[in-house]
Amino acid sequence: MMRRLAVLVLAVAMVAACGGGVVGVAGASCNAGQLTVCAGAIAGGARPTAACCSSLRAQQGCFCQFAKDPRYGRYVNSPNARKAVSSCGIALPTCH
């Protein structure tokens, strides 16, 4: 489990460092690298930290873009990610 978490954090950090984690959405700055603080909640099912909830709120407008991106989709659409978002009191958007 810890190895999987480490791989997730490393993968997101590498993509973000290469500029691949930044996606523009209607003036919003979408950066999947900001969600690395949520790795424990998303990959491991841990309770999201305050920093995680803050990052999720900041990236809320980007959820659909991340969900459609093959690099992040399986994490964003996972039951643990949905649980983390819900625990932070954030409504999941309906993506088209």
Swiss-Prot record:
At the top level, the lineage of the source is Eukaryota
Alphabetically, the GO molecular function entries are: lipid binding
- Please name every pair of cysteines joined by a disulfide bond in this record: 30-62, 38-52, 53-88, 64-95
* Signal peptide segment: 1-27
Keyword Disulfide bond attached: yes
Q: InterPro entries under this entry?
A: Bifun_inhib/LTP/seed_sf (IPR036312), Bifunc_inhib/LTP/seed_store (IPR016140), nsLTP2 (IPR033872)
Per the UniProt entry, what is one GO biological process? lipid transport
Entry keywords, A to Z:
Disulfide bond, Lipid-binding, Signal, Transport
Which protein family is named in the record? Answer: Belongs to the plant LTP family. B11E subfamily.
Role according to the record: Transfer lipids across membranes. May play a role in plant defense or in the biosynthesis of cuticle layers.
Protein known as: Non-specific lipid-transfer protein 2
Source lineage: Eukaryota, Viridiplantae, Streptophyta, Embryophyta, Tracheophyta
